[in-house]
Amino acid sequence: VEHGQIRISGEEWGCITTNESYDNYKLVVEFKWGGQTFDPRKDRARDSGVLLHSNGKDGGYSGTWMNSIECQIIEGGTGDILVVGDGSETYSATANVAPEKVNGAYVYRPDGQAATINGGRINWYARDTNWIDQLGFRGKNDLENQLGEWNTIECVAVDDKISIFLNGILVNEAYNV
């Protein structure tokens, strides 16, 4: 904690975990990107995330994270939904998506067809199709504010649905989670 704010620099990986379990909740996170970056992502897009519906042990996924549904916070891809799990039905998400994948990933479309994933991602509706994992990447339709400015991500979980809002705009939604 610095100056009354939680600071996550990226120098070390870590998490904040609740002691209690929650069914229906609204998690609001205000964030801004700092200028300094660290290995192994020194020259790559600034990257973070919020793990929702986490369960199991720390390190259960890839030796680092708890199994969960992630709201991605990454330059150019904030609001993507990732399934961070073991590939089983226990960790899955269904979303309405565009008819075709883009760069191997589904893209959220409110009026699209239902698709269920047990791993991988569902990109937010306007993620740049030319996204690259490069420091400072910014897509032409990004809703994130400029580097150093505050952004608000809201993760709303009601029953079996998670809705993701970035700066007040619904960018992604999944159900059967």
Label for each model-derived stretch:
Residues V1-V177:
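Carbohydrate-interacting regions of secretory-pathway proteins
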